[in-house]
Every structure is written in C-alpha cells, then in structure tokens.
Amino acid sequence: MPVFSKLGLKSSSALGANRHIVIDGVADGYEAFCLIRLAEEIGERGPIMYIVRDGQRIADLEQVLSFVAPDMPVLHLPAWDCLPYDRVSPGADASARRLAALSALSQLKKAPHPAIILTTANAVLQKLPPEAAIAEQVISARPGNQLDMNDLASRLERNGFERVSTVRDIGEFAVRGGILDLYAPGAEEPLRLDFFGDTLESIRAFDPATQRTTGTRKEFVLQPMSEITLSPDMISRFRKNYVAMFGAPQRDDALYQAISEGRRFAGMEHWLPLFYDKLDTVFDHAGNMPVVFDHLVHEALTERHTMVVDHYEARLRQAEGKEPGSDAVPYKPVKPETLYLTPSEVEKHAEAGGMRIDLTPFGAPEVTGRTIIHADVHKGRSFAEERAATDVNLFEAVVKHIAELRAAGRKVLVAAWTEGSLDRLLQVLDEHGLEKIESVDRLSTVKALSRDKVTAAVLAVESGFDAGDLVIVAEQDILGDRLIRRSKRRKRDQDFI
C-alpha cells in the first residue's frame, strides 16, 4: 500500500455490504500512516477511534501522526493511572485529561470533522460517567458575564480542587477579596479571575512562581477535574446505592462517612457506579464512529480483565479475613460488571457501531462478512548481520542500500528518535558517502522533493518499512535496539492490598 496513494474507501462499493474491514500486512511503524488514510477517507464525515494495546505506544503514535499530517486533530483518551480496586484515586492530571477528551468528543459529535481519537485497551474496558453529567460540569465565561464567585469556589472544591492561600500548582485555587485564582489541569498557566460583585471583569494569566500577570484572556473554559463531583444529589445517590449494594454501613466505614459529609475520599472513584444511576461506555460517548483495533488489542483486553477479576477477588478474600491485610480499613468492592466491560462486550460494541477495522502485520484469511485489504507493507531491512560481521563496514552497507533504493526510483527517509541521534547518524552516513540529504519535518515535504534526495526526520518508529513508494530506514534498523530497560511487575495480591 503506497504511502502517497489513497485506500479507495470513500465509496461504499469498495467495501461491499461488509462493515468489518481487516487491513493486513501493516508492518510495525506503518500504523500512523494507515490511520491518516482512514481518517481522511472513511472518516471524512467525522472522527475515527484507534484502540492501542498499551499506553506506552500513544506518545510515539502522536509524534508520527503529527509528522504525517500536522493539521489532523488528534485526541487522547487515557486510562486511569492506578490499579483496579486500588486505595488511591487516579492522578489529577490523568482524570482531567480523560474528562477534557470526553468533552471534546461530545463537541466532535455535534460538529463532526476528520479527527483521530487515540485510546487504550484499559481505557475502553472501563465505564464512564454519562455524557450529560460531564456536560453539566463544564464552566465557561467571558469578561462581562454574570458569574457568582462564591458558587464557583464551591464548585471547585466539590470537583477536587484544593483551596490554598497562594496558587502555585495544578489543581489549586485561592480567593482573595474579589479575585479568584485557579490552576486547572491541562492549562499552560493559572488564571486570575477579577470580579466586581457577580460580574466577571477580567481574565488574566499569571506566572505561578512570581504571581505576575503574563497576559489577558478573552474566555476561560473549566472542564471537570474529577469523574465525581460531590454535589448534594450525587451524595444522596451514593448513600442510597451503597446501602442497596452492601447493606447498612458500619461505624468504621470511612468511605461512607466521608462521602456523607461531602468530603473527598482517597480511591472513591473505584465506587463510581454508586454515584450515578447508570454509567456509559466509551462507545456511548463516541457514537457510531469507526473503531480501529491495533494488533494484539484482544489479548490486552483479556489480560486487563483478568487483572480486574483477580483484584476484585483479592478484595473479597481480604473482607472475609482470608488474606494478609485483612485487619486494614474495610474495603467493599463493587462487582466488576458494574464498572468494567468484558472483552466480548467491547467487541460487540465496536461491531454495533458504524464500522470496525482491524490492523494486523500478518496475512488475514478470507472470511465471509468482512473485507480484506492488503497493505503489503514490509518490514524494513535490518543490518543485524552487518553489525555482527567484523569484516564489513556497517555504515558503508547502509549507504549502499540507500543508493540501490534511489537507483530504483524509490523515495528514502532516514528516521531517528531524537534530533541529537539524527544529527550524529547523518554525520556518520555523510562521512561514508551519503549525499543529497535534506532534513524534513512533515511527510508532504518528502512527497514534494525529487527522488534523488534522501530525506531525514525525527520519527518515533521502532523499525523501518517498505511501502513501495517510500522506504523508511530507521535508526534501530542500523544500530540495533535502544538500551531501555523497563521494570517488570510482579502481581502479588498482598502487595496490592
């Protein structure tokens, strides 16, 4: 599948009656290029959602997507950054980014346009607050609008903001006379709201270190910071649902006491179903947008759901006194099905939507009910043999390979992970005879340049690929694996509890 050509999916005749597409032969590193084609063609009337197997791939995908199509909107819906049934809440930044993404998703449904929603297997398994409940918590105002400062301060406290004397960190707010300072997650700078009575007079950004004004703003939009807002209605709903699920609370039930008093409790998000009459899924928020599955997502969904069930059962054993830590603060877990989908439910939701698309590096067999599209993108050449050989110059072999590709009329892009590593790599290749190298920052420049030029870019791909009209030679293909060691997790229930 050439990089610079269309997939040919704009017409329904290209798909037949099938709404399930499998694109096979998608080599590692080509996913972002394929996503852009999908977003531009089948997503022409709205966004597409891409589910990746783990969150570590998201940042790399975002970087490559910005190279392939800088103007394509990309939205990231992260998962909670804590374990299932944990005693701690998800981080404030992760929660705020989730809610900001859901609010943006709601706007995309109202005014559809091509965009890519990146999310993970962990994120799609977990249920979410209803769309209407999130929309009710969004606050926006301009200078001259009527806005009750005391009501705003109360809403900030209920939403998880910490009241302080001087705002310096994200998630803090302060009130001094007719001035309210707040630092919202996701904001580049904190804001200073100046009130005259119930009228918002001005909005100014300021430096949290010096407290000095850095500029003015025409508007501020405050997204919810937490998936739980301790309003009187929500507290009442929690109390009713808690008693219905667990029976009358005991005196030592710290969770029930804290929520009843309107105080936030560490880890209360793990009882999210008790705060709402009904939770939504990611697919409810997304509507009928096409859903694209990364390779191995099903395995990631199964692994995560197994972890959810394991941790739930560990909490039950703890409550029954059969587990180390049983003398700790009581923990009454909600059933997994109230907070999480199963892998099969995720599959059903995806298939019930507008279209399901699977990406795989392998060949896919023809099966009734789905359309197979052959990407025919191959993994790039590895220079492992040249690295191991003592009588071969590695970089001369790379230069020779690139020369052969250019002679065949192929466009070549040399990719590295950082500016520094790219500069060093190009310097060495130049010393070994590579000529006409031009650094680029977007794919359109690669397309516009003549084929006799070799382009180079910072690109977060593990390995290169051959897409026919473009060959990417990656830093890792030449120099070998990067020396990054990731700590291994050991799943021990007693450590979790």
Segment roles from a protein language model:
Residues 1-497:
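Conserved beta-alpha structural segments and adjacent helices that either
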